[in-house]
Amino acid sequence: MTKIYIYCLFDRFDRFLGVYSSLKAIHRDAVKYCNVGASPVYLLSDEGAEKASLVALRNLFKGKCDYEIQYRSDSRGVKVLKTKLTE
C-alpha cells in the first residue's frame, strides 16, 4: 500500500479553495492569495510563526499527517491541511 498525501486549501472562513498533491503548487497559491496587503506573508503553526517559504513549509509538514498550517498577512489568511488519501 502506497502512502499518498494530499494538501487541502481553505480560506479563513473555512471555504474550500482547492486540493493539491504538490507542496510547491499549494505554497504558490497560498502566497498568491495572501499577498495582498502591505505586510509579508507568515506561516503560523504549533511551533510559532516564520516567514513563508517552501523549505519552511516542507520542514513543518515533515513526518506529520492530519496537520494544519496557516498562512497569514495583514489582510488575508488561508489554511493548508495535510492528510492521507485513503484507499
Label the model's feature ranges.
Residues 26-27, 80:
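Generic low-polarity alpha-helical segments
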Residues 35-87:
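Short, mixed-charge low-complexity intrinsically disordered segments
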